[in-house]
Amino acid sequence: MPKVALLNQTGTQVGDIELADAVFGIEPNEAVVYDAIVMQQASRRQGTHDTKGRSEVRGGGRKPWKQKGTGRARQGSIRSPQWVGGGTVFGPTPRSYAYKLPKKVRRLALRSALSSKVANNEFIVLEGLTIDAPKTKDMISVFAALSIERKVLVVTADYNETVVLSTRNIPGVTVVDAAGVNVLDLVAHDKVIFTKDAVARVEEVLA
């Protein structure tokens, strides 16, 4: 079982915490992690692109010149695709790019990302995270005590509005609850901070 230090908000070690092997101690599967990231990014695409076909472009109802006798190539509409200003052939239309990998694959990707963070010493567990009032400087003090200077993902057991409001003005900081942990956020941040209760929630679902 992987064991990591259990810290308080001042950065002092108050004990150790053993993490579930099945969640935090597996051999990371990079291919599955990649597939999960592509799935998430595809789901975030707007898909609002649109082009007009020959039936949608304004004009072109009249035949530009008679069929025979001009010596020119026959044409039926100035909005045919070969004309400048004509319709687009097989152009993009609004669509959803979202798709879902099988649940087992998604969970394997999440376990792989978590295990990778633990193996690379990028995983921090706090005994608790309590902020009395929404104050950015209080969260900055916590990060300073934990020697965190770069992008960090904070995971709480439940939605914590005070923590969310205290971090929203700090660049590179993302806060999610245990149910919202995802592969893209884990990979995109240099450090991950879990509260002790959040670890228990994640293990309950993924173990």
From Swiss-Prot:
Pfam families named in the record: Ribosomal_L4
Gene Ontology MF terms in the entry: rRNA binding; structural constituent of ribosome
Domain of life per record: Bacteria
Keyword annotations from UniProtKB, A to Z: Ribonucleoprotein, Ribosomal protein, RNA-binding, rRNA-binding
Biased composition regions of type Basic residues, renumbered to the chain: 60-71
Quaternary assembly: Part of the 50S ribosomal subunit.
The protein's name in its UniProt record: Large ribosomal subunit protein uL4
